[in-house]
Amino acid sequence: MTSERNTDIEIRLLIEAIYLKYSYDFRNYSGASIKRRILHALRQFDCLTVSALQERVLHDPGMFMQLLQYLTIPVSEMFRDPDHFLAVRNEVVPLLRTWPSIKVWIAGCSTGEEVYSMAILLREEGLLERTIIYATDINPHSLDRAKQGIYSMQSMREYEENYRLAGGRRDFAEYYTAAYGNAIMDSSLRDNVTFADHSLATDSVFSETQLVSCRNVLIYFNKDLQDRALGLFHESLCHRGFLVLGSKESVDFSAYSDRFEPLVKPQRIFRKS
């Protein structure tokens, strides 16, 4: 048996052990993606084998929380793919206005950049006051960072261009306070935001929504888990609600391909049919 085959077996055992011990379910994540992340963590933790990593993770919850940062890839940016946000502003917002109150679910919100981007967009369109945003993720460390809303000033300078290209209407600096090399987001942007732990692999729907945003998350799932997540989104959305996905994601070829219709297909914006 080759060493690579041994490693694949060890990874399956580690993923199963994490599920049994900590109830985090990575069993239906993309095999190639999860393997790449675990092998990267292996080098960072100076473990010779995945089995050695498993022993440390099982007996040290702190080590598991460190590993979780590698497994969940907490990387995001504000107004990522500006054309997407411009399409939401121009094509989705006019239709959202027809509802007296709006609920938005941002699934896999990571460290919150997408949440603040959506809140800024909705504020500029006069909808934030009557909107509740549910921001969910499986990584508690990422959720804590999202709640704090503190980002590096270097990042904010990069996000400013995204904001402008996404149709931003104000001075981006109005939305944060600069302090010691960081940007602290205006706390009023999260007045109507509920941050919550939620797993697309194991949890169920918790509210009816008009808009679900889950961008650059499904690409890390296998087909079964993609279908499960799309099922949750379909169940959550009200009649004619909106689903927005990442640039490399689609409902095509899924079990729910006939239950959504494209609204702005190049920007991966769909509507429940």
UniProtKB/Swiss-Prot annotation:
The yes or no answer to whether the keyword S-adenosyl-L-methionine is present is yes
Q: Indicate whether S-adenosyl-L-methionine appears among the record's keywords.
A: yes
What GO biological process terms does the UniProt entry carry, in alphabetical order?
methylation
Q: Where is the CheR-type methyltransferase domain?
A: 1-273
The record's keywords, sorted A to Z, are: Methyltransferase, S-adenosyl-L-methionine, Transferase
Give the knockout phenotype. Mutation does not affect chemotaxis and biofilm formation.
GO molecular function of the protein, one example?
Answer: S-adenosylmethionine-dependent methyltransferase activity
**SUPFAM superfamilies linked to this entry:** S-adenosyl-L-methionine-dependent methyltransferases (SSF53335)
The residues listed in the UniProt record as binding S-adenosyl-L-methionine, with positions renumbered to this chain, are S76, R80, E114, D137, S199, L200, R215, N216
Taking the record's annotation, the residue ranges forming a coiled coil are: none
The record's section on Pfam families has: CheR, CheR_N
Q: What is its EC number?
A: 2.1.1.-
What Gene3D superfamilies does the record tag this protein with? Vaccinia Virus protein VP39
Supply the name of the protein.
Answer: Putative methyltransferase Cher3
